[in-house]
A protein has these predicted regions:
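Conserved short loop/turn motifs at secondary-structure junctions
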Residues: 1-7
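A penicillin-recognizing enzyme superfamily signal
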Residues: 7-184
Length: 184
């Protein structure tokens, strides 16, 4: 399933990528809404969402059941989360990757660009080992953003500016390599 091929909210995407960044653990997401007045005084910030944290998981008999999961619960094997994250980091680290601008942060970053049909929406969801952020650019109505307005061009610069500020006083962290993962 490619980003932009079916309706998925920014909330859902960011929450999913947080599982990779946290070595397979469920993370209770926050919408970060910041409202500043004309003097740049912060009027509103972080709101924690705690409603409807049910997740579909498969039990040993391969049937689906609703099981309540809490913040920090291991919902994906560490090795699986690491391998997925390692692949997603390629979007940033590869010289022609659509997220290559994020290399500017000079730290390990995973991320994925996304553009819906006819440039109606542009996304970038990216993460370091300790922070996951998603950016969506688009209109509430079905108006296109314009030719060439992709996730890498429209959303990634916003994400990058935010992450530069958010991570500037934090140490550079590596994604932890779980037991059983070896590099040749």
């Amino acid at each position: 399933l490619g980003l932009g091929s079916s309706p998925v909210s920014l909330f859902e995407l960011t929450r999913a990528y947080a599982i990779f960044a946290s070595s397979g653990k469920l993370v209770v997401p926050k919408y970060i809404r910041s409202v500043h007045d004309r003097d740049n005084e912060l009027l509103l910030s972080s709101v924690v969402l705690r409603n409807n944290l049910e997740t579909q998981v498969q039990d040993s008999s391969e049937t689906q059941t609703n099981v309540k999961k809490a913040d920090g619960d291991q919902i994906l094997e560490e090795s699986e989360a690491f391998l997925a994250s390692h692949l997603i980091q390629g979007v940033v680290s590869h010289p022609r990757g659509t997220g290559r601008r994020a290399k500017k942060l000079k730290r390990p970053i995973g991320g994925k660009t996304g553009t819906t049909n006819e440039q109606g929406d542009a996304w970038f969801v990216g993460y370091s080992p300790n922070l996951v952020t998603g950016v969506w650019v688009g209109f509430d109505s079905k108006i296109g953003l314009g030719r060439g307005e992709t996730g890498g061009r429209a959303a990634l610069p916003i994400w990058l500016e935010y992450m530069e500020s958010a991570l500037q006083n934090h140490p550079v962290l590596e994604f932890p390599v779980p037991e059983g993962i070896f590099f040749a």
